C-alpha cells in the first residue's frame, strides 16, 4: 500500500471509530437486548421474540403507533405544503429576499427542548399567549384532540424551515430557459406551476418528504416537554413510549423492542411511499 492511501485511511479512522461507537454498536446491542428480559438484581433471561409478541398485545403500544402515524402524516403534510409556499414566495425577485430567507430559517437553529417550552407558554391555558389574545380558554394541553394539534403546530414551526430550504434549492435549480419557453405558450402562472415547476421539483419534493418522515418518526423532545405524552396517552409517540419503558420501568429489553418496531414501521412507510410514487409517475 502506498503512503498516500495510508494517510487517507488514517484521517478516516476517527470518523469510522465515531460511527462504530455511536451508531453501529448501539444498533446491534439494542437488537441483542431486545431478545432478553432484563431485571436488575437477577440474570438476564433470553425470551426470544417475547418482547415483540408483547408489543402486539400491548394496548399502549398500539395507541402509540396510532398517535405516531397521526403525528407524522399531519406534521409532514403541513410542513411540506407550507415549505413549498414559502419557497415559491422567497424565490421571487425582491429587495428584501435575503432578509426574508434569513428570518424563515431561524426556527431551525432552535433546540427542540427550547421549542417545547416556548410553545408550552404559548398554549398554557391560564395566561398563555394564544388564549390571552383570543380572550377564551381553549384546553390546548388538557384536551386529547387539542394536545396533539399543539404538538404538530410546535413541530411545524421549527421544521417548516427545513422543507423551505430544500424546496428553495430545488426551485433555483430549474433552468430559466424552461420558464422562458413556457411563457411563449401561456402566461397563466397556475398552469406553469402544475406543468413546469412541480414536475421539475418532484425529486426534491420526494427527498424533503422522505427526510421529514424519517425525522418525524423519531420525535421526542417537543412532545416530551410540551405534554409528557398526555393528557392520558393522547400524545404518546413511540419514542416516548420506549423511553418510558426503559427509564421509568427499567424494562430495557421491551424498550429496545419498541425502538426496533419503530425502525421497522419507518422502513415499511418509506417503501410504501416509494411504491406509490412509482405508480403515480
Label each region the model flagged.
Residues 3-281:
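A structural signal for multi-pass alpha-helical bundles of membrane permease subunits
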Amino acid at each position: 500500500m502506498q503512503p498516500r492511501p495510508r494517510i487517507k485511511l488514517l484521517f478516516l479512522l476517527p470518523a469510522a471509530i465515531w460511527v462504530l461507537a455511536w451508531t453501529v454498536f448501539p444498533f446491534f446491542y439494542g437488537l441483542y437486548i431486545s431478545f432478553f428480559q432484563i431485571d436488575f438484581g437477577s440474570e438476564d433471561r433470553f425470551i426470544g421474540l417475547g418482547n415483540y409478541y408483547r408489543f402486539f398485545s400491548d394496548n399502549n403500544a398500539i395507541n402509540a403507533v396510532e398517535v405516531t402515524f397521526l403525528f407524522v402524516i399531519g406534521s409532514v403534510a403541513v410542513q411540506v405544503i407550507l415549505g413549498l409556499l414559502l419557497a415559491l414566495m422567497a424565490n421571487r425577485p425582491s429587495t428584501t429576499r435575503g432578509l426574508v430567507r434569513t428570518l424563515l430559517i431561524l426556527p431551525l437553529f432552535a433546540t427542540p427542548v427550547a421549542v417545547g417550552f416556548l410553545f408550552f407558554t404559548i398554549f398554557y391555558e391560564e395566561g398563555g399567549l394564544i388564549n390571552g389574545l383570543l380572550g377564551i380558554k381553549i384546553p390546548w394541553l388538557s384536551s386529547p384532540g387539542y394536545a396533539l394539534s399543539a404538538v404538530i403546530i410546535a413541530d411545524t414551526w421549527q421544521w417548516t424551515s427545513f422543507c423551505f430550504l430544500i424546496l428553495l434549492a430545488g426551485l433555483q435549480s430549474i433552468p430559466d430557459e424552461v420558464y422562458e419557453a413556457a411563457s411563449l405558450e401561456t402566461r397563466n402562472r397556475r398552469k406553469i406551476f402544475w406543468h413546469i415547476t412541480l414536475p421539475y421539483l418532484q425529486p426534491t419534493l420526494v427527498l424533503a418528504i422522505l427526510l421529514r418522515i424519517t425525522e418525524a418518526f423519531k420525535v421526542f423532545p417537543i412532545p416530551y416537554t410540551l405534554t409528557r405524552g398526555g393528557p392520558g396517552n393522547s400524545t404518546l409517540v413511540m419514542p416516548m413510549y420506549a423511553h418510558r419503558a426503559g427509564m421509568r420501568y427499567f424494562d430495557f429489553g421491551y424498550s429496545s423492542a419498541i425502538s426496533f418496531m419503530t425502525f421497522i414501521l419507518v422502513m415499511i412507510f418509506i417503501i410504501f411511499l416509494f411504491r406509490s410514487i412509482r405508480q403515480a409517475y
